[in-house]
Amino acid sequence: EKGTPGFSQGKGEEKHGIRASNTSPLTLDEVVVPADNLIGGVPGQGLKQANQVFGYTRLMVAAMALGAGEAALEIAIPYAQERIQFGGPLSDKLGYTHKLIVPHQVNMLAASAYLEEVALRIDSETRDLQVEGSIGKLFVTEAATRCADDCMQALGGYGYISEFEVEKIKRDVKITCIYEGTSEIQQSIIATFRWKVARKSKGAFYGAMAAEMEALAAQRGDLGAADLARAAKAMQLAFDFATAQRLTKQQYLMFTLADMTTALEVGMALSRKAAAAADREAAVLAAAARVFSANAAQLFARGLRTLAQGTRLVEAEAGESLLEAAGAAQLALAGAGTVADMDTIADALFGRTA
């Protein structure tokens, strides 16, 4: 409590963002804390108790980041429609829309789909969803940070001016990659626990994902589900390979595995949402699902190559066997029609007619 001997509060920090929130150091020098002040009821259980709520507290941080990314797009999109350059609005320039706007709209749609799914599961299930919370936080906060950066770029010099707000969004959203566990902590959690479940289930965990996406691809061939089915099968092989080659203590490689399964699981949520969509939203979500799944497949191809050939720890023959078994070459070829799909999304965003 304030006034406790040995406890002092420093002056407020000058921060990169969230400046309206006071942040100051707290110093405890030989502070005696009464037993009655114990939080949680049982000594030594603090981390375990915290882990029980991280599934939704990290999801809350991800939702904050999603709002920031969407807010940045809501500034950049009308600006692109109004700003005339080289004889027409910026919204007609594919180098502008397809680099600075559309990829982030795809990611925000994927983020929304994943967070909705996990939030509904938290409301209806009692089991721990810590890994899902970590996946949501890792993907959404990093995607929103990139989104805000490109939306600032999309406004040119105006993006650097406080009046247009994007620079503030860019400063504020960065904290979501840091507090409630940094992105690197999330990668460690995701890789470790997904590796454990891949081993414990003996392939059933990712096998079920592959089967679901294969069934969706058979029902609807236009949602990128076939790419995700291949990725799910490759994910199990990648974890098996990491175990066999004793790569699980190589932190960077575990981060690579975390990024792979994150892309897979977020992509599945977007494909499911696209399958359930109706009316005008359906075409845009289907296009976004195809773009996202193609990007995920290409990320898998790069990740598999990193595992197989990126270190001195793996024999060349073993690495080649992984790439062949996991279908890395086929995953790398994903992306047919991506530009046309981005056209569809841009048309909807900017109200363009074909």
Residue ranges and their predicted role:
Residues 1, 29, 62-64, 93, ...:
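Generic beta-strand/beta-sheet core signal
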Residues 1-66, 70, 85, 162, ...:
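FAD-binding core of flavoproteins
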Residues 18, 124-214, 280, 284-354:
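Alpha-helix capping/hinge segments and adjacent helical runs
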Residues 39-60, 73-106, 116-133, 159-163, ...:
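Glycine-rich cofactor-pocket loops
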Residues 67, 102, 106-109, 138-145, ...:
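Generic structural signal for well-ordered, non-transmembrane alpha-helical segments
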Residues 78, 113-116, 145-153, 240, ...:
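Charged/polar positions within long, soluble alpha-helices
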